[in-house]
Amino acid sequence: MFSIRISTVVLAASALLAVAIPMTNTETPQCNTGPIQCCNSVQSATSSAAAGPLAALGVLSGIASLLGEVGLDCSPLQVIGVGANSCSSQAACCTGNTFNGAVVLGCSPIKLL
């Protein structure tokens, strides 16, 4: 009878320990639409910060409201090797066109782990 109680206590303690151990996520964030971009900022296309670069590309202000968020001054983020997953500004997943990295359309900010 005593051994059954000991077994039950040990089993319960093991289950609690397994639940209490934190799990770490070591997966690299990924972007299904292309490379992760490291941008100086991600702004609404209608913001004053994006107005200048978009105007330089010939995007009319009325059309800017259709673009959503844009990445400004972006470069592809390396996920392998030296400096992997390091972006000192804003990492973003972008679905639209890239204009020499100055402006990237259709961006959403992401958090690097």
Swiss-Prot record:
Tissue-specific expression:
Expressed in the fruiting bodies but not in vegetative mycelium.
What main location does UniProt list?
secreted
| Main function | Aerial growth, conidiation, and dispersal of filamentous fungi in the environment rely upon a capability of their secreting small amphipathic proteins called hydrophobins (HPBs) with low sequence identity. Class I can self-assemble into an outermost layer of rodlet bundles on aerial cell surfaces, conferring cellular hydrophobicity that supports fungal growth, development and dispersal; whereas Class II form highly ordered films at water-air interfaces through intermolecular interactions but contribute nothing to the rodlet structure.
Query: Which UniProt keywords are present, listed alphabetically?
Result: Cell wall, Disulfide bond, Secreted, Signal
Show the InterPro entries listed in the entry: Hydrophobin
Q: Where in the cell is it found?
A: Secreted; Secreted, Cell wall
Domain of life of the source: Eukaryota
What interactions and quaternary structure are annotated? Self-assembles to form functional amyloid fibrils called rodlets. Self-assembly into fibrillar rodlets occurs spontaneously at hydrophobic:hydrophilic interfaces and the rodlets further associate laterally to form amphipathic monolayers.
Q: What is the name of the protein in this document? A: Class I hydrophobin POH1
Please give the Gene Ontology molecular function terms for this protein: structural constituent of cell wall
| CDD domains documented for this protein | hydrophobin_I
Q: Name one GO cellular component term.
A: extracellular region
Q: Which family does it belong to?
A: Belongs to the fungal hydrophobin family.
Q: Which cysteines are joined by disulfide bonds?
A: 31-93, 38-87, 39-74, 94-107
Task: List the signal peptide residues.
Answer: 1-26
Q: What induces it?
A: Expression is induced by natural light and low temperature.
